[in-house]
């Protein structure tokens, strides 16, 4: 699956799990979790893509540690990570027992394929609905300092896409519009990147505005210093 689907399904599974355990995972972490297994691309050729970071032997213990250490937030984040393996096993295969075995397991519906396109574009639609109902869409439409952290999944999605294309000698612009299915997925990526970019802009604007306010540590002192607040809105706390 492409990063559009991975980030969106991660958001969906993380938010659903977080609601069940009464922990609200920030939007940027919910989007990032499902992208993490593809971080092996950053470490090529030291680590071959689609090996260790796509193995249950590696990820299940990692997620267990996260859940034990961070409780509800760890469970929600882990749900996003594991959604990556579920998605890849639907449209392709994964090596669940690597490095003990090279066995590949999956339904392998195809990539790209109508099924994959429906899963990826559909996931983006579900994310927009959840963001609207949970009011997280305000990270994009209003100034909130937390929104600046959306830069993390934004940069990850863009750089991983470029690196993967470069490593595999894929002419990205030509490939993106070579088939109708890919065109829809490309437009979905563009929409997601645009939304995240707008959120980062709103976050940066909020940070700059806060720093200019009297009483902020970076502003000239005016009377008694005021304690600075948390950079995260209270509604994102567990």
Spans of model-derived segments:
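N-terminal membrane-targeting hydrophobic helices
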Residues: 1-221, 225-238
């Amino acid at each position: 699956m492409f990063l559009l689907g991975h980030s969106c399904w991660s958001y969906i599974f993380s938010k659903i799990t977080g609601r069940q355990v009464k922990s609200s995972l920030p939007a940027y972490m919910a989007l990032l979790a499902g992208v993490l297994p593809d971080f092996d691309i950053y470490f090529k050729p030291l680590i071959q893509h689609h090996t260790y970071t796509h193995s249950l032997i590696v990820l299940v213990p990692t997620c267990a540690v996260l859940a034990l250490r961070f409780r509800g937030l760890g469970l929600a984040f882990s749900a996003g990570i594991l959604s990556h393996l579920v998605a890849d096993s639907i449209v392709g295969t994964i090596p669940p027992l690597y490095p003990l075995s090279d066995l590949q397991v999956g339904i392998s519906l195809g990539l790209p394929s109508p099924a994959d396109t429906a899963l990826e574009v559909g996931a983006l639609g579900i994310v927009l609905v959840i963001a609207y109902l949970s009011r997280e869409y305000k990270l994009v439409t209003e100034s909130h300092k937390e929104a600046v952290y959306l830069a993390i999944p934004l940069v990850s999605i863009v750089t991983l896409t470029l690196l993967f294309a470069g490593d595999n000698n894929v002419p990205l612009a030509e490939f993106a519009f070579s088939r109708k299915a890919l065109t829809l997925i490309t437009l979905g990526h563009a929409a997601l990147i645009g939304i995240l970019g707008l959120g980062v802009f709103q976050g940066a604007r909020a940070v700059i505005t806060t720093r200019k306010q009297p009483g902020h540590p970076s502003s000239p002192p005016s009377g008694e210093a005021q304690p600075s607040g948390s950079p995260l809105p209270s509604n994102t706390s567990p």
